[in-house]
Amino acid sequence: MVRVIIKGGVWKNTEDEILKAAISKYGKNQWARISSLLVRKTPKQCKARWYEWLDPSIKKTEWSKEEDEKLLHLAKLMPTQWRTIAPLVGRTANHCLERYQKLLDQAEAQDNQATSSSLGLIGTGEAVPSADDVRRLRPGEIDPDPETKPARPDPIDMDEDEKEMLSEARARLANTQGKKAKRKARERALEQSRRLAMLQKRRELKAAGITIKQKPKKGSVDYNADVPFEKKPLPGFYDTSAETSKSYKAPIGKTLQELNNRNAGPEDATKSKRQREAEEKNKQAKQPIAGPSDEHIRKLKEADQITKRRKLNLPAAQVGQDELEAIVKIGLAGERARFLVQDGSSDATDSLLENYSALDSAKATRTPQLAAHEDSVMREANHLRLISSMQTPLLGDVNVDLQSSKSSGIQTPGSFVPQTPNPLLTPGLRNGQTPASASDSRLHADTSTPQRTPLRDNLGLNVDDSFQAGHETPRELKRARSLAQSHLRQSLSSLPAPKNDFDIVVDEQDVELQANSSSRLDNEPAMSEEDAAERDARLARQAAEEEARSEARRSQVVRRNLPRPAQVDLSRLHNQIDSRYRDRVELLVARETAQLLHHDANVHPIAGGKHPEPEAVQFDTLSDTSLITARELMRKELAEQLGFPGANQEALKRMVAASLNDDEEGMQRLEDALKQQWYEARNNKSQLVEQLEVTRAKMARIASQAAKGEKMLTKVLGGYQARSVALLNSTKEQFKALQEAAISRETFEYLGRGEQCGKADRLDSLRKEVESLARRESMAQTAYKLLAEERSTLQEHCEMLEMELLMRQAESLNEANLSA
């Protein structure tokens, strides 16, 4: 019984590969020829398989939310028109239908789940089968659309039919030659066999003594008689002028194109230009006219799909890099100022200074949780499911109650884009918000996010002007005013109760000021006579105050009894300052310093110095107010340089001491300078002994450092030293080799001069030998010519004798025939 093959069924991986290879060879129009390679598939099935699954332009990725929304919207506008919807969505019609059914099933499942959970209809019986279980194929059923499903993998042991189909397809697809190529090959084989037959025939006739003269072909060459491609030399001597003028230098600095076009002239350039133009015309003529190719269409589809992707739109930077750095510097300066103020302030004023650190506020800042929004895809799918199950309007039934949606019937449902609130955004009204809505939003301030968060206002000093936006009518203004008053009453009612248990602390400066004022009152003429003891005490107090003020007017060096020179030559210092400083400000500062040194050395001399007359010293004495102002300016300048503007004197002392303690090297240099420079020749012997010990300790320390440095350098530079010795030995060997080469060169030069002297004699002898050989060759050529002429004469004579012999034999034969 003949086996009947029913074409169709599940596609296998082997069949897919054969189909793709056949389409690459035969194209997408010869489906009958393509299906002839597949035993179990028809042309229609092959075409459907390609356009539903194997086409590279088919999109098989996961469905995005935008694609789902577009699919549901188009299904509402064009129900059951999947061939029209498919190119708009960018998927195949079958994929669109499957996705549509899946979305409806999901919406129905959610609806059923919500209904059952609300009514509590959960029993112990079997659950209702899902949509996937209903659509899943049962045993014995046949898939109606196998072309849209993935291929079945190949088994390890294939059937004989599949192996035969695969081998036949491989053989047919490997045959890349067409009918014309086969015909040409067949004609070449026939021509070769005909030529061999003719050669065999001539060979046999020649062996039989029959010579057939072959007619030469036109334009052919007889390789037995002629030398192919022979070029006979011209008579005479060869012209070598072209060789002597030819340059044999290496083509250094020239490109390959210059070398190839070295002999090209203007005619060659014109010819190449015409050839390029002809090639361009041929390419344009060979291009297809009937529309773009399939590859071009596929690229356009991919570009269309790429353009449909959502772009990443980020807002522009509201604060630049420079502004961020400035904000950081301001914050650090504020923190330092707060630290300095807290260091010297009292507890009574601590409550007036708030902490505006951005780090603490950033730690507490969190992105607010977004409210759960409804899934628009499921909502639209549920709408379509209800619409599809709705009865005809002729029955008069109630319409389906659809949920409110942002989308109308003519646009795709909008999507919700979650955004992080921006606290740096300028506060104001929303787009399209009316003043009334703005005022209403103020009423619900406890449930909504305010328009602006007051920054750096912990004491509530700034006035909130957010109420003034949008109040245009008198009614709104009155309403806003009443709200502000009620808010103020609530704020005042929340204030703590007043406290009266305060302690009065009197500062010592206030006591001194009070004493000064009392002393000024004492200076006025009194009504009664002053007591002598009180007068003496007042005078002593005034003298002490004047002494304190005089002590304050002295320089820091004198007050602290710091080392200073015993004698100062002011004119010499001025000359050195004028020659060293060019800047006017530095020059003035240096001159003032020299003047102050000279004043201190003369007015407040040290032990061992001279005591000149104070009247000879010219120095402008400043007032107490000027000194206080100058010291305050110095304090501010030093605080700004240290990065702590507004710091007090004690804080500056601590910071300067800390910086000097960190600079150990500078302190060591200062101590060494003080130990070496600030001493007098009249010091006692113990000081010199101490200085000697210090110097010896310094020498020992320097010697140990030098030994360590030498050891370290030996370790570091040992390799370099060994390398230097090796290079020195190599240099000596090379120099020796150079000397030997120079001696060899001189030797060969001497031999060359000797060869130059004997070259002429050898050339003469060789020339004579060549001349004798030439004479002998000419004589031999003459003898050869005579012998060749004699040989030709003898050959002609022999031929004549042979002809005469043949004639006599022919005559004898004729006579014999006649006599017979």
UniProtKB/Swiss-Prot annotation:
Residues 31-54, 82-104 bind DNA. Residues 114-162, 248-294, 405-476, 514-560 are annotated as: Disordered. Residues 3-58, 59-108 form the HTH myb-type domain. Keywords: Coiled coil, Cytoplasm, DNA-binding, mRNA processing, mRNA splicing, Nucleus, Repeat, Spliceosome. Residues 132-155, 268-283, 534-554 have a biased composition (Basic and acidic residues). One of its GO terms (molecular function) is DNA binding. Gene3D superfamilies: Homeodomain-like (1.10.10.60). Associated with the spliceosome. Belongs to the CEF1 family. This is Pre-mRNA-splicing factor CEF1. It comes from Mycosarcoma maydis. The lineage of its organism: Eukaryota, Fungi, Dikarya, Basidiomycota, Ustilaginomycotina. The gene is CEF1.
